[in-house]
Regions:
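Sec-dependent N-terminal signal peptides
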Residues: 3-13
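Subset of outer-membrane beta-barrel
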Residues: 20-342
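Short, Lys/Arg-enriched, disordered terminal segments
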Residues: 1-4, 342
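Sec/Tat signal peptide C-region and signal peptidase I cleavage site
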Residues: 14-19
Length: 342
């Protein structure tokens, strides 16, 4: 019954292809997909490398949704631009959704300019553009006219014909960031971005079916995070995230804490809890070892979908490494946000 219900819900989406944008619960650990102005916005390092993986709905689907990404960004021309620098980076995302094997591959390049405003604030503007490919294996799909009264049978003939099961398009994003750090124990950061500013067309049909617009609506993203060093052992990080696209929205609020277990800040424990409004609680655990951070989250479903998945929504991990170009950079005191390292 679960599979039948999900199949019926999925079929109308094929016509308009208004698919949900790829996303992670750990939006803060996927900086370049959240806001292109995050490119090179690395408060405590010169460069950053990362990987994300998300597995969703494995409790109710034989083929769960799987999303993965790798990214990297760096600060450049830091010593050549007065009180500013450029950020350059890129991200590759890959997603496989459901039994129809709807596969999405995205490759983006990002650039951002960061300008200090005095000694305690920073303003950033960023832009990215990239190539997106979507393809689908229609042999694994079942359509309404293949329902025999009891079951869907994909061996039955269907009137649905996909004109182009493989589509490509160009996508663009813009964003801004502002950070305020009045002292070594306090840090605030807020950003706003607009994705799909060129509103590319995304459809497996050459002509739009009646009543459908296959252009991707702009997606608006706003976020806020802060960092407060409470002692030499504890740093608190409250965060909030909001996105809206074509009337669909997502809001996440929460808090995590870093606990210094080594004294010098090289080893830290991370724990936190987030809430996606109307959908899920998201507990988080993680560990920092020198410049490597590993974070795991689990979406505990609280919406009506919990009747089908038993509260088991998705699990996700992020692996991030921060680094410096040389030992001198690592020794300098350049962190803009609270740190255990002196």
């Amino acid at each position: 019954m679960k599979i039948l219900l999900l199949g019926c819900l999925a079929m109308p989406a094929l016509a308009g292809l208004h698919a949900q944008d790829l996303h992670f619960s750990q939006w803060f650990n996927s900086p370049l997909t959240t806001n292109p102005a995050n490119t090179g916005f690395i408060p405590d390092a010169d460069y950053r490398l990362g990987a994300n993986y998300r597995n969703q709905w494995s409790s109710i689907m034989s083929e769960p949704y799987k999303t993965m990404s790798i990214f990297g960004d760096a600060q450049v021309f830091r010593n050549r631009i007065q009180s500013g620098w450029l950020g350059l980076g890129g991200v590759i995302m890959h997603d496989v959704a459901g039994s129809g094997n709807l596969t999405t591959t995205e490759v983006y390049g990002s650039i951002a300019y960061h300008q200090m405003l005095g000694y305690s604030s920073l303003l950033t503007a960023g832009f990215n553009t990239g190539w997106v490919n979507k393809r689908i294996n229609s042999a694994n799909l079942k359509f309404p006219d293949q329902f025999d009264g009891k079951f869907f049978d994909n061996q039955l003939p269907t009137s649905v014909v996909l004109d182009q099961p493989n589509v490509n398009f160009l996508d663009m994003q813009v964003g801004m960031n502002y950070a305020y750090f009045p002292n070594e124990k306090t840090y605030f950061n807020a950003g706003f971005s607009v994705q799909h500013i060129n509103q590319p067309r995304e459809s497996f049909f050459i002509a739009n079916p009646a009543g459908f617009d296959s252009h991707i609506s702009p997606r608006y993203i706003a976020f806020f995070n802060a960092s407060f060093k409470r002692s030499d052992l504890v740093i608190l990080n409250p965060m909030a995230y909001y996105t809206n696209q074509a009337g669909a929205y997502e809001a996440v609020v929460g808090l995590n804490a870093q606990y210094n277990i080594s004294g010098d800040g090289d080893e830290q424990l991370i724990g936190g809890l987030y809430y996606r409004v109307g959908d899920a609680f998201i507990p988080m655990v993680g560990f920092v070892y020198h410049n490597i951070r590993l974070v795991f989250t689990y979406d505990v479903t609280t919406s009506s979908l919990s009747n089908y998945n038993g509260n088991r929504g998705a699990w996700e991990f992020a692996l991030i490494q921060n680094g410096f170009y040389n030992q001198y950079n690592g020794d300098r005191h350049q962190s803009l946000c609270p740190s255990f390292r002196q």
